[in-house]
Amino acid sequence: MEYKIEYTTIEPIVEEEVSREAAQAYSEDGASMYDGIRMISRDESKKKRIMSDVLVSVRILCNRLIDHATLSDPTDGEEAITLTITLEMSERRRQGKGESLKTLFRSLTVNLFLNKFFASKNQVDLASKYDAAALADVQTIAKLLYEKLPPTYPTIV
């Protein structure tokens, strides 16, 4: 069974320098957060800053999960649950810093089978580049989401 989180942002999409590539990356169904970040920026410092900004938003999203998440039943026989969540701008942006930055994603899908995801070669490479505690925030949101799923669904392994 597959679980997906679908994020719908208020703002159209990203920062001017990478908006075209980002739009192209996210026009394809199923692009993951990490694949998208690799696609939209080859510059390591910019990529790390974008990653950090996304994780700030994810942290805020965790705090507001109950208010913003809506569960929908599987449709057309697909064994999946989609959580549609409004992804707000980070506190940093709301305080007037980084005004030129727009919300990074129009939509993105994250695979919740994170133990397997994190064990993949690409994820190991990313873990060496990005702060381990920040990556743990992604695990945290998966745990919070899983706790809201009906008890009849299987555990994440």
Each model region followed by its residue ranges:
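Conserved short "hinge" loops at termini or chain/domain junctions
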Residues: 1-98, 140-157
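Short loop/turn elements at secondary-structure junctions
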Residues: 24, 101-157
